[in-house]
A protein has these predicted regions:
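Helix-to-loop junction immediately C-terminal to a conserved catalytic motif
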Residues: 51
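Catalytic Walker B motif of ABC-type/P-loop ATPase nucleotide-binding domains
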Residues: 161-165
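Conserved ABC transporter NBD signature motif
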Residues: 58-66, 75
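ABC ATPase nucleotide-binding domains
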Residues: 232-253
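Conserved ABC ATPase "signature" region
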Residues: 99, 114-132
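Conserved ABC ATPase signature
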Residues: 136-140, 144
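H-loop (His-switch) and adjacent beta-strand-loop-beta switch element
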Residues: 205-222
Length: 253
C-alpha cells in the first residue's frame, strides 16, 4: 500500500519541555494505525503535529507534499480531526454540528449545497443519530456528544482521519459500532490514525505505533513478535499474546 502521510524527524516542545524527539512514522492508504504508549509518551502531541495543530521541527508529508505548504482549506479537506475532549457548540442542533464538517467544502457565497445536506443525512442515518437531529449538543451525554462529533469528522470525507481517544466516553455497544465504522472506512481507502489507551482495541488495528518518552519505539503489525516484546518493555508488564478469531489480544500474566 502507498504511503499517504509521513512524519520525518519530528521534534516538538510544550512550554519549552521536549515532548517529541526525532519521531518518524509512515501511514499507508487504507490502513488503521493505532498509537499507544504510557502517559506522557507524546501520543497526542504526535497526532496534533500530523494534523498541523502543533508547531514542530522536521517534516510532515501529505501525499508527498509538505503539510506547511498546503493552504488551510487544503489541509481541512485532506485531514479530518476528532479531539480527545467532547467539545463543540452546545447551542447548535445535532444536524448543524454534523454540517460543520462540510464547511471546508463550502464557499461563503454558496453555503451548504444539496450534496452537503445529503452527506449529513446519510451520516445521521448510518450512525443512528436521526432521532437527535433537532436536539442541541448541550443536552447530550459525553458519549452521545462524542458520537455526534465523530459524525462531524466523517462529514469532511477526508482521505485521512486523525482521532485522539475517540471512544473514551463511549459505552461498549457503541465502541463496537465505532470499530465497525473504522473498518468500513479503511476498506474504502481512508487512512485512520488514532490514539487509544485500550491495548486490546489497539491490537485490532492494521499497525500499532508504540511511543515512549517522546520517541517512536516501534511501528509493526499486531502479529509481530517484536511488537509483543516492545509492549511488555514499554508498559513494564508481563503480557501473553493470543490470537482469537483472527485478532490478537494481550493478557496480563
Amino acid at each position: 500500500m502507498s504511503t499517504i502521510l509521513q512524519a520525518i524527524g519530528i521534534h516538538a516542545a510544550w512550554d519549552k519541555v521536549p515532548v517529541l524527539l526525532d519521531a518518524h512514522a509512515d501511514f499507508a492508504q487504507g490502513q488503521w494505525t493505532c498509537i499507544v504508549g504510557p502517559n506522557g509518551a507524546g501520543k497526542t502531541s504526535l497526532l496534533k503535529v500530523l494534523a498541523g495543530l502543533m508547531p514542530a521541527q522536521g517534516e510532515v508529508l501529505l501525499h508527498g507534499q509538505k503539510l506547511q505548504s498546503l493552504s488551510s482549506r487544503q489541509r481541512a479537506t485532506q485531514l479530518a480531526w476528532l479531539g480527545q475532549q467532547a467539545s463543540g457548540s452546545d447551542d447548535l442542533s445535532v444536524f448543524d454540528v454534523v454540517m460543520l464538517g462540510r464547511l471546508p467544502h463550502q464557499t461563503w457565497w454558496t453555503g451548504a449545497t444539496d450534496e452537503d445536506r445529503a452527506v449529513v443525512e446519510n451520516l445521521l442515518a448510518s450512525m443512528q443519530l436521526t432521532e437527535w437531529r433537532h436536539r442541541s449538543l448541550g443536552t447530550l451525554s459525553g458519549g452521545e456528544r462524542q458520537r455526534v462529533l465523530l459524525a462531524r469528522a466523517l462529514a469532511v470525507q477526508a482521505p485521512v482521519l486523525l482521532m485522539d481517544e475517540p471512544i473514551a466516553n463511549v459505552d461498549a455497544p457503541h465502541q463496537a459500532d465505532w470499530l465497525a465504522t473504522v473498518q468500513q472506512l479503511t476498506q474504502t481507502g481512508t487512512t485512520v490514525v488514532s490514539v487509544l489507551h485500550d491495548l486490546n482495541l489497539a491490537l485490532r488495528a492494521d499497525q500499532v505505533l508504540v511511543m515512549q518518552a517522546g520517541r517512536v519505539v516501534l511501528q509493526a503489525a499486531p502479529s509481530d513478535p517484536a511488537l509483543h516484546a516492545c509492549l511488555q518493555q514499554v508498559f513494564d508488564h508481563r503480557l501473553s499474546f493470543h490470537q482469537v478469531q483472527q485478532h490478537w489480544v494481550a493478557l496480563l500474566v
